[in-house]
Amino acid sequence: MQNIVRTAQVVERFKLQVIAGEEGLHRPVATPDLSRPGLVLAGYYTHYAKNRLQVLGKTELTFYASLSEEKRRERAKILCTEQTPGILITRGFDIPKEIEEEAEAANVPLMRTNAVTTSIESQITNFLEMELAPMTAMHGVLVDIYGVGVLIKGQSGVGKSETALELVKRGHRLVADDSVEIRQTGDQLLVGSAPKLIRHLLEIRGIGIIDVMTLFGAGAVRSHKKISLIVNLENWDAGKVYDRVGLDHNTMKIIDSEVPLLTIPVRPGRNLAVIIEVAAMNYRLQNMGINTAEEFAERLANAIQDTEGDL
């Protein structure tokens, strides 16, 4: 699912001052990439990225002021198209009257901010990348365990929320329960968050819905987290062979990214919170180049080889 971001959302998020073209605030912003239209102001229109937010800083405005009035008017008309989501003036600079008049005539939102050009560019790009990223929703619980984003999945009633509650009591942080919104950013990272309606809430059968932040404090929750590991909880199946060494490397595809997947069988007496906690720590160790399962397999192979040599 692809989200739609409109210029009005950018204005609200970054507290921008709207100077002209308010009727165009409903225009969609189709890409997180911004445009510094220096070449357009210089008269080269061939590759004008008119569907991007246009950012005019000190360099562009200084050059624009050096043009004749006729050229300023011409370039302003080129800037303001039906597809242009908006024009942003940075550093609080005065707005050339030609740009203001053409923006108003074409209903192109003309905005201004006191922020430095490079700073506001970076902030808006990050905001748009997150909002426009491909998104899906999955049933599960997302918890930050020792800095590792662990998505706990499983059938309804298997104990996901109860396990998350125990993890929160052990000092870890809840991101989302029941429904996890997952966005894939430009660098193929999966970032999970909770829908606004159920943010910081946890459903425990027999108790009901609890507010984790109210009960355990602000340190027990976070708004979003990169998903690094998926743990699938399933009822113990005596006829199924589960990985007992750790050499199996399974993954699960979410959008376009593959995420490591562990399957943990559930049966009475197993402390799932501790097991998942250890799984997160083991994942961190593997990222540091320490793989206990592979080291054990290597030692075992060496021992067998030595034994065969003695025969």
Swiss-Prot record:
Entry keyword set: ATP-binding, Carbohydrate metabolism, Kinase, Magnesium, Metal-binding, Multifunctional enzyme, Nucleotide-binding, Serine/threonine-protein kinase, Transferase
Additional observations: Both phosphorylation and phosphorolysis are carried out by the same active site and suggest a common mechanism for both reactions.
GO biological process, one term: regulation of carbohydrate metabolic process
Recorded domain comment: The Walker A ATP-binding motif also binds Pi and PPi.
Region (Important for the catalytic mechanism of both phosphorylation and dephosphorylation): 202-211
CDD domains, alphabetized: HprK_C
Active-site annotation: H139, K160, D178 (proton acceptor), R244
Superkingdom field: Bacteria
TM region(s), chain numbering: none
Subunit structure: Homohexamer.
Gene for this chain: hprK
Cofactor field: Mg(2+)
Function field: Catalyzes the ATP- as well as the pyrophosphate-dependent phosphorylation of a specific serine residue in HPr, a phosphocarrier protein of the phosphoenolpyruvate-dependent sugar phosphotransferase system (PTS). HprK/P also catalyzes the pyrophosphate-producing, inorganic phosphate-dependent dephosphorylation (phosphorolysis) of seryl-phosphorylated HPr (P-Ser-HPr).
Coiled coil location: none
Catalytically driven reaction(s): [HPr protein]-L-serine + ATP = [HPr protein]-O-phospho-L-serine + ADP + H(+); [HPr protein]-O-phospho-L-serine + phosphate + H(+) = [HPr protein]-L-serine + diphosphate
Chain segments carrying region Important for the catalytic mechanism of dephosphorylation: 265-270
Name listed for the protein in its UniProt record: HPr kinase/phosphorylase
EC number: 2.7.11.-, 2.7.4.-
Chain residues that bind ATP: G154, Q155, S156, G157, V158, G159, K160, S161
InterPro entries: HPr(Ser)_kin/Pase, Hpr_kin/Pase_C, Hpr_kin/Pase_Hpr_N, P-loop_NTPase, Ser_kin/Pase_Hpr-like_N_sf
GO terms assigned for molecular function: ATP binding; magnesium ion binding; phosphorelay sensor kinase activity; protein serine/threonine kinase activity; protein serine/threonine/tyrosine kinase activity
PANTHER family: HPR KINASE_PHOSPHORYLASE, PROTEIN YJDM-RELATED
Family statement drawn from the similarity comment of this UniProt entry: Belongs to the HPrK/P family.
Residues involved in Mg(2+) binding: S161, E203
